[in-house]
């Protein structure tokens, strides 16, 4: 796989975050790996806008690309999330061009709210929705219906296929991938183990047929690693992905 497609989600440094390391410091620690695409997690920020400005400076210095993961629903009580402009402002401040949220309670009748997205979202930003670990936000038929309506109304919004999340909603990842492929702009690659509940793990030596899954996606789509890992584990997994031939 072309290295330029690979994204590192800061969840890989979960332990460092739990020990108080800032997201800025996490990115600086990961830079020597040689990758330039990073997914930043909103829940990892401490509310200090100075950190966002420093991340923007870091982006310019090293020519980084930022993806912004926002653990919030796009639709709340049938309307666009009232914090959406805040999320966009944060993304602008740090220089993130890709936003990720979850669907929320869109019911097909709030078309006017959906169309507002074209006015609110800057042309330089791409908004994508992810299947999380809840059936409310990850039911395949519901997601397909939403993206169909969005397309019919010329609303530019895409899908993030989190391959390791389908197990939480007891849906088949192969079927989900096939049905949502026309809308997919981004992929999260991880696996799960079920020895003690369901836990997120590396895709290497996984229960998922990740090779078969990845071969279904367009060759330019970004692929993010999103699971806790040590630096040595991360290096190994990045090497496996780099050597994967589509």
Predicted feature residues:
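N-terminal pre-domain/capping segments
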Residues: 1-82
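Generic enzyme active-site microenvironment
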Residues: 37, 128-130, 160-163, 224
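Catalytic-core regions built around general acid/base machinery
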Residues: 51-62, 86, 113-120, 145-149, ...
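Hydrophobic residues within beta-strands of alpha/beta enzymes
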Residues: 38-39, 99-101, 127, 187, ...
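Active-site acidic/histidine proton-transfer and metal-coordination neighborhood
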Residues: 65, 75-158, 168, 237
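Histidine-acidic metal/acid-base catalytic patches
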Residues: 1-31, 89-95, 140-161, 167-246
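Short, electropositive alpha-helical surface patch
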Residues: 56-65, 119-125, 219-220, 235-246
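Active-site-proximal loop/turn and secondary-structure-junction residues that shape catalytic pockets
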Residues: 12-14, 42-44, 70-74, 103-107, ...
């Amino acid at each position: 796989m072309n290295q330029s497609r690979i994204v590192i989600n800061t969840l890989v440094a979960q332990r460092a975050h739990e020990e108080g390391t800032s997201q800025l410091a996490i990115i600086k620690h990961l830079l020597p790996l040689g990758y330039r695409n990073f997914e930043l997690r909103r829940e990892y920020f401490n509310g200090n806008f100075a950190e966002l400005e420093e991340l923007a400076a870091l982006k310019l210095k090293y020519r980084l690309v930022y993806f912004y993961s926002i653990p919030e629903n796009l639709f709340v009580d049938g309307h666009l999330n009232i914090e959406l402009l805040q999320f966009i402002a944060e993304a602008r401040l740090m220089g993130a061009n890709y936003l990720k949220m979850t669907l929320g309670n869109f019911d097909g009748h709030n078309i006017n709210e959906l169309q507002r997205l074209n006015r609110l979202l800057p042309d330089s930003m791409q908004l994508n929705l992810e299947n999380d670990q809840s059936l409310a936000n990850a039911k395949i038929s519901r997601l397909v219906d939403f993206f169909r309506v969005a397309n019919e109304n010329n609303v530019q919004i895409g899908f993030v296929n989190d391959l390791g999340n389908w197990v939480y909603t007891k849906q088949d990842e192969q079927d989900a991938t096939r049905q949502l492929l026309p809308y997919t702009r981004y992929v999260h690659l991880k696996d799960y183990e079920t020895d003690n509940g369901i836990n997120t793990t590396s895709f290497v030596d996984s229960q998922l047929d990740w090779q078969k899954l990845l071969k279904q996606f367009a060759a330019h789509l970004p692929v993010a690693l999103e699971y806790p890992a040590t630096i040595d584990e991360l290096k190994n997994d990045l090497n496996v992905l780099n050597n994967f031939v589509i």
